[in-house]
Structure formats: C-alpha cells, structure tokens
C-alpha cells in the first residue's frame, strides 16, 4: 500500500518541516506550498508548488471560496493527486493550523480505521435542499444533486477511489466546489466508505462541554496554552495557529 501525507500551507514553517521529517510510518511526505517560490530543502520532505494558471485552466478551482485566492492550496492538492501523481492508495491532507498530537498519530489512526475511503470529522446530511441552516449550503446549489453532506476536512484521509471520483467530477464539470461539502458528497454519492474517527473530533469549531480549551481573539478561535494533560494521543486539534505551541504540546 502506498500512502502520502500532504501538508497544505502558504509557505514552509520549520515546525511543520520537522514534524513531517519525524513522522513514523511508510509515507511519502509532501508539503504543498501555495506560493510559487519555496526556498526550503529537506532530505525526506518534498516541497511542491503548482502554477496558479495551470491549476485553474485544468478545472481545479473554486474549492475554497472563503479565501480570496483562486485556486487555493486545496485546489492545487487535488490537481496534484488527481492528475500529476494519482498513484497513492491513501493521502492524508492536513492544513498547517491543525495540530497533530504525535508523530505516530497518523499511522495509528490508519491502523485503527483500515480501508475507509474518507476519514473526516463528521458526515452531516441535508436532503431537502434548504440552505438557511448553514451559511455554506448555497455553495452546493447547481453544483451537485441532493443529498448533500458536510464535514470540516482541514484534516482528512482520502482514498485513491475517492480521488478518482473527484477527478471525474472535474472532467465533467471543469470545476470543483466548496471543500466542506464536496468531499463528503462525492464520497457518499459513489457509495464509498466514510468513517468519522473519534480522533478527529477535536477539529473545531464546535461547542465544548466543561473546561474551555479555546479562546476567541481578534475574530478567531484558537487553542489556548494549557496543561499537556489536555492533549490526547492520536488526536488532531484545530485551530492551533501559534505554530510554536505545536512543538510544545506534541507528545513525541
């Protein structure tokens, strides 16, 4: 089985490079950088940049309308693993503000959940087409037939079968659509296996019960500095935008 870890970023950060270099398991380690120039080298991490115009013209666009740039790093990641190198059986996609609690977490989660086509936080369904319940439902209108499904996918694992179905969608429509709807919806539409591991349930935003572990500052939530006892092995946490805390809290 051939697997990859793809960390999505604007540009490399030493914390993320170190994390990828130290990850356990037999993975290709890829950092997909949205900027055209990287200026970083590593013996075990491959740094990939993709020209905006090429990605857009090939139909890999519109995956994240929440950011001003189109194509986004997500569009480029789909372009790379759907067209440039579709050889991987499984690919982990991880945004740079996701904190992975251990260098063993990905291989451990892979071992637990086996051959699912999509590992993600949730798989919420809408069947009636009413878009008032969630701001982003409108992004599915005229892009895919009902039912629609959603999940935060800032950390997710995708199979070769699902990547092929995403490629088929681009080939037929010459576009993508909002990532938090598209990935789950295409998976479910094609009767693929979607699993929501407990290890991904700390991917926010969602309500917290008991002790607060996030703070709201300057219009955004982020994880506050706290005791290492709050970090659970194999869990993924989002958002943690202070990259220095990744090194501080990582268990090994």
What do the predicted segments below correspond to?
Residues 12-24:
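Short, well-formed alpha-helical segments that are part of the catalytic scaffolds
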Residues 88-97:
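Short beta-strand-to-loop acidic/aromatic patch adjacent to the donor-nucleotide binding site
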Residues 36-87:
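Active-site-proximal specificity loops/subdomain of glycosyltransferases
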Residues 2-3, 24-31:
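Short loop->beta transition adjacent to catalytic acidic/histidine clusters or analogous donor-positioning motifs
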Residues 170-252:
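C-terminal catalytic/acceptor-binding lobe
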